[in-house]
Amino acid sequence: MGQVLPLVTRQGDRIAIVSGLRTPFARQATAFHGIPAVDLGKMVVGELLARSEIPAEVIEQLVFGQVVQMPEAPNIAREIVLGTGMNVHTDAYSVSRACATSFQAVANVAESLMAGTIRAGIAGGADSSSVLPIGVSKKLARVLVDVNKARTMSQRLKLFSRLRLRDLMPVPPAVAEYSTGLRMGDTAEQMAKTYGITREQQDALAHRSHQRAAQAWSDGKLKEEVMTAFIPPYKQPLAEDNNIRGNSSLADYAKLRPAFDRKHGTVTAANSTPLTDGAAAVILMTESRAKELGLVPLGYLRSYAFTAIDVWQDMLLGPAWSTPLALERAGLTMSDLTLIDMHEAFAAQTLANIQLLGSERFARDVLGRAHATGEVDDSKFNVLGGSIAYGHPFAATGARMITQTLHELRRRGGGFGLVTACAAGGLGAAIVVEAE
């Protein structure tokens, strides 16, 4: 076991998570169509503060993330402060770590708490895949800049004459890695082939995710942590996630064609997480501040870890890399965990990471560790379903997972939970939480 790194303040206070909330998650271009991420962020933070009944001045910092950036609101965190009735003096800044963005937001607020610069803060994220920053071609962008500097009409017309019809076509946000040109689904296909993961295994995991998420909603387990969203023009509220397919069968999954490698692939729309709109946030405090306010924490941060690997091959292995480091810093092993919640970007990616967590060879030859991190106990794994079912508003997923895990730990009488995710750019994140 390596060095244990306790997450405590200089006074010995633990970092408490006192509350968490999210919007329902909606598939692209459905219930939240036309609502930008900044408005989803305001929606969830405003409701979180109202439910917690914490005075606005108690919150000293808000760290929020957004992956699909909107140029007109580059600092989503500050816009949320200004748009929710929070104290205007609240420090606010934005972060981005792809699919692990709200993991980073939580870590940043925790570090402010440990440094003693604040005693309470909010962390979270929001994304909209329905309101996208549609851009212009590089050539058109350059011409427009030059036109703005031109002094005469003839100069402007000459500049415009350089353009061709193709230069005028709108450019949607990139869906591929900037450095490699590979789409996330291409990487998932790589991983399926590298680790021998079959189409049947992927479909089975996706089906499991939907069934468990549907059961969680049916049992009322998510009601406390998901707000009802009232959507302009306020005629139709959204109270539940709208991607979950509780009535599907494995035969339904088998009907879909591969989405990326059309000839030989196994990754489909059904065994991948869909483009999604939504927001999620958590309130963090020092343990003593929570006691002063008479608040009973949902749980506490035990450790966190971030890792990075190469992007050319099998880059979505973040959980296999970050989990052993987070467990080491927490002073725990896999067997100590009550729950394991892994982000399901793709079924292939999820199954590959599960495989490598239990691999002695991977631990020894790749991580340089003496033993495997540990086998993943299916009875502890994604017990309420995962991102394939709920959806994945990129910056919101981490906060959803943390809140969901802490609520489930409390229902089970406490224990330790691991929350982990892969992210674009070969990044990985893992957070260990505990509940009493």
Swiss-Prot record:
| EC top class named in words | transferase
Q: Which reaction does it catalyse?
A: an acyl-CoA + acetyl-CoA = a 3-oxoacyl-CoA + CoA
> What do the Gene Ontology cellular component annotations say?
cytosol
- Gene Ontology molecular function: any one: acetyl-CoA C-acyltransferase activity
According to the UniProt entry, what is the EC number of this protein? 2.3.1.16
Q: Which residues form the active site?
A: C99 (acyl-thioester intermediate), H392 (proton acceptor), C422 (proton acceptor)
Under Pfam families, the record lists: Thiolase_C (PF02803), Thiolase_N (PF00108)
The record, for InterPro entries, names: Ac-CoA_C-AcTrfase_FadI, Thiolase, Thiolase-like, Thiolase_acyl_enz_int_AS, Thiolase_AS, Thiolase_C, Thiolase_CS, Thiolase_N
Query: According to its UniProt record, in which pathway does this protein act?
Result: Lipid metabolism; fatty acid beta-oxidation
The subcellular location is:
Cytoplasm
Q: Name one GO biological process term.
A: fatty acid beta-oxidation
State the oligomer form and interacting partners. Heterotetramer of two alpha chains (FadJ) and two beta chains (FadI).
State the similarity comment.
Answer: Belongs to the thiolase-like superfamily. Thiolase family.
Described by its record, this protein's role is as follows: Catalyzes the final step of fatty acid oxidation in which acetyl-CoA is released and the CoA ester of a fatty acid two carbons shorter is formed.
Q: What is this protein called?
A: 3-ketoacyl-CoA thiolase
Q: Which organism is it from?
A: Escherichia coli O6:H1 (strain CFT073 / ATCC 700928 / UPEC)
